[in-house]
Amino acid sequence: MILRSEHIREPDGDSGAAMNQGDETDRRQHTRNMRVMRVARLAAPDIHAEGLGMVRDVSPGGMMIDAHFDLELGQTVSIALLDDQELTGTVVWKDGSMIGVSFAEEVPVDQILAKPSAQPDGKRARLPRFAVQRPVQLKLETAVVDAILHDVSQRGAKLQCEGKLRVHNNVLLRAEGQRAVAATIKWRAGDMLGVEFHRLLPVSELDQWLKL
């Protein structure tokens, strides 16, 4: 389980052996925690909801996460740092938007924090995608076409569009009240297409796309 900093105490020279032993256990647990700043997709299966989270602290036993949607104590939550990599845990403490999630079994921290690599089928592991259903526009050099945004990540998006767009076309993804994002069409299947952004979306900007 993730320990919050206020739970870590300095050893008291007048304390008994049992207390010293408990403090030593706390310190060992604390040293196993790794501070990070990673975007995650959080999902609550019991209410069929998902949202954005920022993982701040990871240990083999759990995570500390800044959750951008409401989760309750005791609730089961699924955490995806990559689109095809999910961990499941239980919310064991809550302080404002910060939550502590405990895993039933320890996880290999180095593996779950490793940089995305090629999968066995040759495809690149992707950052977590977030499902949305939002009207947007795609601007080309000579035209603007309407589209529906189906999912979005920090690196790209999937859209539905009937316009005559081709793979490798450069477009500008726009929505009312949102900063436009330059992108390149990477694939198309029927009226569905995928775009790759020319820049990595900051967390605050990704959050705004999810709230449109």
Explain the meaning of each model-derived region.
Residues 1-212:
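Structured alpha-helical
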